[in-house]
Regions:
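N-terminal secretory signal peptides that target proteins for export/translocation
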Residues: 1-18
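Bacterial N-terminal signal peptides
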Residues: 23-34
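A short beta-strand-turn-helix
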Residues: 63-84, 255-277, 297-303
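Short pre-active-site segment immediately N-terminal to redox-active cysteine/selenocysteine motifs
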Residues: 82-84, 89-92, 275-277, 281-285, ...
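Thiol-/selenol-based redox modules, centered on thioredoxin-like
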Residues: 183-256, 359-409
Length: 409
């Protein structure tokens, strides 16, 4: 008997018993609430509603989805291929990202051999907690998919199913990545993992490739299903948890400390710590500072469990503290926030050093040995900052992400 991967739960449906009679107004209200909460009436609203995995021997469900190329893709577009490989993957999951290169290689290796590889992003982007983005630069929205595709020079059709999850509901992927291999008649012959280890150098079994090779050779697939191990599919019902996490963070206290020139010098050295240090200098009178601040706060929550401290330093005058506090509270800035205690901002510039000319915003990433890893004078490009962070963060929970962010493919 198959051992299901974590997150795969058979669908159950509840019914209102025939003996219950509801006033028409109440019934209409219930229906309106249901449709308002989700546009698709089959979308899971709880873990009990998660669809089952498509069964071996089933026909490939049709799809009509927008790709990152701006075109619609359907099952019929791949009718000429002898074998169709459909893989559910995403951007935010560290395990999923570690498979991008292998999926790209799979696509390349079988090009011209009658094999089509199609990748579908089936997560609900709004169901992803900020804390689940601690190893990524991006979420799972359509625009973010395009950014990842271009950044990694990917070569396969990458399709978006995040708004309704209509296709994911038909296939029932439990995790990312989750592969489905269909024969020429589009009968499912294999579903499960791509191989047996997220770290490519440790993978010894390659079930997806084996299934493709067997079908091309006209042979039965020996291993028909395996557990798909990775980040669980983010079904719509998980939106509530993502919102609750934000609300919980918003309730944390906002603090502001006064910092002397000497304290800024000590901050710059970043000694006696096992964390990277990201510092953003700003002021309430600086338009670009105000504009980019929400992105900075998003990073605070994304990387809260990683080895990095994010600090903001306001160069407002000390008697403007109340304005600084007000803004920080509006932004729910729960990280460490400083206000330079001197009345001459040039003293702050001199104390911190690092060739800062004094203009704000000024953002700098400092390593664990005090080395400057990244800096930008002027408007911050949040994507560049995140990638600089990820490239320099050590493997603090498991092995593989440091190599991923420092690889080129």
């Amino acid at each position: 008997m198959r051992t299901p991967s974590f997150g795969s739960i058979s669908r159950r449906r509840s019914r209102i018993g025939s003996g219950h009679v509801f006033p028409a107004a109440v019934l209409v209200l219930i229906l309106l609430c249901c449709f308002a909460s989700r546009g698709q009436d089959d979308a899971p609203v709880s873990a009990a509603d998660v669809p089952p995995i498509l069964k071996i021997g089933a026909q490939a469900p049709d799809f009509n989805l927008m790709g990152v190329d701006g075109k619609m893709h359907s099952l019929a577009d791949y009718a000429s291929s002898k074998v169709l490989v459909v893989i559910f993957n995403c951007d935010h999951c560290p395990i999923a990202s570690m498979y991008e290169k292998r999926i790209k290689q799979l696509t390349s290796d079988y090009q011209g051999r009658g094999v089509a590889v199609v990748v579908i992003m089936g997560n609900d982007p709004k169901a992803i907690h900020l804390s689940e983005k601690g190893h990524t630069d991006l979420g799972d929205t359509y625009p973010e998919m395009k950014l990842r595709y271009e950044y990694r020079h990917l070569n396969y059709p990458y399709l978006y199913d995040g708004d309704t999850q209509a296709v994911a509901l038909k296939y029932g992927p439990t995790a990312t990545p989750h592969a489905f291999v269909f024969d020429q008649q589009r009968i499912l012959r294999y579903e499960g993992r791509i191989d047996n280890n997220a770290r490519e150098e440790l993978a010894t079994k390659h079930e997806t490739r084996d299934a493709v090779d067997s079908l091309l050779a006209g042979k039965p697939v020996a291993v028909q299903d395996t557990p798909a191990v990775g980040c669980s599919t983010k079904w719509a019902y998980k939106e509530a948890g993502a919102k609750a996490e934000v609300a919980e963070g918003d309730e944390k206290p906002v603090t502001l400390e006064m910092a002397t020139a000497g304290q800024l010098t000590a901050l710059r050295k970043n000694v006696g710590t096992d964390k990277l240090l990201l510092v953003n200098f700003w002021a309430t009178w600086c338009g670009p500072c105000i504009e980019e601040f929400p992105e900075l706060q998003k990073m605070v929550r994304m990387y809260a469990k990683r080895q990095v401290e994010i600090v903001t330093v306001s160069i407002n005058n000390p008697d403007e503290k109340k304005f600084v506090v007000k803004f920080l509270e509006e932004q729910h800035a729960i990280n460490r926030n400083l206000l330079f205690s001197g009345s001459d901002s040039a003293d702050a510039v001199k104390a911190f050093g690092t060739n800062w000319t004094g203009g704000v915003p000024y953002t700098i990433l400092i390593g664990m040995n005090g080395e400057v890893l990244y800096r930008t004078q002027g408007d911050m490009n949040a994507l560049d900052v995140r990638r600089a962070l990820l490239k320099n963060l050590p493997d603090d929970r498991y092995i593989g992400q440091h190599a991923y962010w420092n690889s080129v493919f």
